[in-house]
């Protein structure tokens, strides 16, 4: 997992040197990081970074709604929330920069391929509900429902992808059985609501990281990203659900949009 985290940082944190990334991910020296990275990915860290930048640039240039000139972008500050209002071809979206609190969460984790697998997620949520419902957690209006994406599908092999379905709990509550517990750190997040069908999630995540983030004055942080299920915003239209995609961010060294 250290190497996969390093690969993500190479792509998302251009201001960090390769040596800094290796040390951040727990390698004792730049040489040990370089050797391990090349064995795992089949190319050097510097080449990997340059290839990823080239691919991202090609996607940015070739897709019409990812062309900066084709987007209408308005930035608004209200109290403690900075909002990006973005109008593209056939859509309007709002990305809020918010400070989220830390949460103690109970979770069920799955390792393996999960893209578009609604049956899998139903089983995971039912398993979590079996433990949480008798405690009144699913009917608690203060409960927060999250899906945590631990790995980048573009980097991690499908059979090693990890995903967790989660519910917020009190700090002193101890889960049992297959239900785990962890603390999700708070901090600054970019939050955007989407109404998605089972096959729509990759494009929504891609829009956040590939369209909005490069145009913002932020860069990705290395905390975990997640989807928040919004019970009171659901619409009765089949399999589509409303979620807020939340990605951890920090201020970039320079602003791309003035």
Question: Language-model features: where?
Answer:
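Short alpha-helical "recognition helix" segments of helix-turn-helix
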Residues: 21-23
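A solvent-exposed interaction/effector surface
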Residues: 4, 8, 16-19, 28-258
């Amino acid at each position: 997992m250290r190497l996969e985290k390093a690969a993500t940082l190479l792509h998302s944190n251009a201001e960090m040197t390769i040596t800094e990334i290796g040390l951040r991910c727990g390698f004792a020296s730049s040489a040990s990081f370089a050797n391990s990275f090349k064995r795992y990915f089949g190319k050097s860290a510097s080449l990997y970074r340059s290839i990823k930048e080239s691919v991202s640039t090609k996607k940015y240039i070739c897709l019409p709604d990812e062309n900066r000139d084709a987007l209408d972008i308005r930035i608004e500050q209200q109290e403690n929330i900075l909002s990006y209002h973005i109008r593209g071809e056939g859509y309007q979206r709002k990305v809020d920069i918010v400070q989220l609190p830390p949460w103690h969460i109970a979770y069920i984790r799955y390792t393996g391929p999960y893209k578009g697998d609604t049956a899998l997620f139903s089983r995971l949520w039912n398993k979590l509900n079996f433990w949480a419902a008798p405690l009144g957690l699913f009917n608690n209006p203060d409960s927060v429902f999250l899906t945590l994406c631990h790995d980048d599908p573009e980097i991690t092999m499908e059979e090693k992808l990890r995903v967790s379905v989660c519910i917020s709990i009190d700090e002193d509550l101890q889960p049992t059985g297959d239900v785990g517990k962890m603390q999700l750190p708070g901090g600054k997040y970019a939050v955007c609501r989407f109404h998605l069908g089972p096959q729509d999630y990759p494009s929504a995540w891609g829009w956040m990281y590939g369209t909005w983030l490069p145009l913002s004055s932020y860069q990705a942080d290395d905390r975990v990203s997640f989807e928040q299920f919004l019970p009171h915003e659901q619409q009765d239209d089949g399999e589509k659900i409303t979620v807020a995609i939340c990605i951890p961010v920090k201020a970039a060294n320079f602003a791309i949009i003035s």
